[in-house]
Amino acid sequence: METKKNNSEYIPEFDKSFRHPRYWGAWLGVAAMAGIALTPPKFRDPILARLGRFAGRLGKSSRRRALINLSLCFPERSEAEREAIVDEMFATAPQAMAMMAELAIRGPEKIQPRVDWQGLEIIEEMRRNNEKVIFLVPHGWAVDIPAMLMASQGQKMAAMFHNQGNPVFDYVWNTVRRRFGGRLHARNDGIKPFIQSVRQGYWGYYLPDQDHGPEHSEFVDFFATYKATLPAIGRLMKVCRARAVPLFPIYDGKTHRLTIQVRLPMDDLLEADDHTIARRMNEEVEIFVGPRPEQYTWILKLLKTRKPGEIQPYKRKDLYPIK
């Protein structure tokens, strides 16, 4: 049996402490999600949408972060439009998570008929050519599903992740992610294990939109504002000798289908400077997210790092004060 952690890979392992009564609530939540995942999507999606919107009204801090992000990224939209985007975001989140749980429980053959790939020929050609690949994946709510589907088809996948605060949720979530194989690398272990996996032929999964602070980031345009963006994908392409391929999943709660959009490799970044790389990374996020903003995790502190002299928007008391 594999240990929880080897030289480069994180492997979730059940701990006997998870049986303690303090975790019973978490297990109840896991059981509820499993039951929901086994419910036909035409029944579960409307219910999950209503529950998600309701939770979004209760989660005032998360809602505030989302509204702040949207107000800076889409100032041309009315307040009502931004509120509607946030409502739809909270509706989409549990729907996408339920599809991920369904995939883990029932297997890919049960959800493949509801998955549409746009640009699948790009992936197939790279597989035929035995190329090394790093997917550039904006942080959408269905972000894990494409990697799980590719892993279920025999493609070796590797991704980095942050641990969940609740150890039971962390164990279950990462067990689901590894359901069909692949490697998980904890961000706390640095980027070297991820690089090692890609060099060994695993296709990498890289989320470009987290705020890593000002030290190694570039301040570049992001929708109507700017963002501190780490130009890591360019460096990863070089050290891994890999091609960077933008990918984004979109879950439609009305049709109960997942569309996975794949764009052409970003080969233009091989000779680009850091500023250009960072801007191109944000540009790909804009192309994917702009038409379907409800798919994106606007609750993150995407715009935390600001230029000298500017106040972090989430600390500004004039922006959406919590009542």
Residue ranges and their predicted role:
Residues 2-19, 83-87, 124-128, 152, ...:
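Non-catalytic C-terminal accessory region of glycerolipid acyltransferases
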Residues 129-188, 214-221, 225, 255:
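Catalytic core of membrane glycerolipid acyltransferases/transacylases, capturing the structured
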Residues 31, 65, 121, 145, ...:
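Short Gly/charged-rich anion-binding patches and loops
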Residues 2-137, 170-172, 181, 323:
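Membrane-anchoring hydrophobic helices of lipid-metabolizing enzymes
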